């Protein structure tokens, strides 16, 4: 399992994109020689700091079968100061700091917490979120995926599992040339319905 976790809401959709890229490029049932292998790491999207509270119990104490990839931002577009109005409450220590400081402290402390449980992590740091840096990030992740495909010995540029469901949809919707597939598909659907699926 491979977790992509940016600590910036502006990078939230990088995780969505990466999950799609990683799954369709590396989830294969045949290697380049045609051997049946059923391979591919499962990508998971997360957003820091939100998903620390929804997923990290599993990541820290569950099976050690995940790599967590953090994306940090060094310089945010805006700086939001935390006011000192809460001095006499349990969160008074935050007064005078920034939300940017808090976000990076969340990323760093979460990474250390994972290391306490011997969980592997990777951190990518972006100087800032702009077209130049995001383009470099996307390109690096594309190259990473291509290299992973070579290591898994699979064709990263095909997606037969996706094509199959597209063809089934064409058949169900009556696209010309898919009449035989429609008949076969109706039989399969009836069989699944009888099993209660």
Residue ranges: model-predicted function:
Residues 1-197:
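A SIS-like phosphosugar-recognition module
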């Amino acid at each position: 399992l491979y977790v992509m976790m940016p600590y910036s809401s502006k990078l939230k959709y990088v995780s969505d994109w990466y999950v799609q890229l990683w799954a369709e490029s590396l989830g294969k049932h045949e290697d380049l020689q045609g051997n049946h292998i059923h391979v591919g790491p499962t990508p998971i999207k997360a957003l820091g700091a939100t998903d620390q509270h929804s997923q990290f119990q599993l990541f820290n104490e569950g099976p050690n079968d995940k790599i967590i990839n953090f994306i940090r931002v060094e310089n945010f577009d805006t700086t939001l100061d935390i006011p000192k109005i809460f001095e006499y409450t349990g969160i008074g220590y935050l007064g005078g700091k920034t939300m940017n400081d808090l976000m990076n402290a969340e990323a760093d402390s979460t990474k250390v917490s994972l290391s306490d449980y011997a969980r592997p992590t990777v951190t990518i740091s972006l100087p800032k979120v702009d077209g130049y840096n995001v383009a470099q990030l996307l390109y690096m992740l594309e190259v990473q995926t291509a290299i992973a495909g070579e290591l898994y010995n699979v064709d990263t540029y095909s997606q037969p599992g996706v094509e199959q469901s597209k063809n089934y949809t064409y058949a169900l919707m009556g696209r010309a040339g898919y009449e035989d597939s429609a008949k076969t598909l109706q039989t399969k659907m009836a069989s699944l319905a009888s099993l209660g699926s």
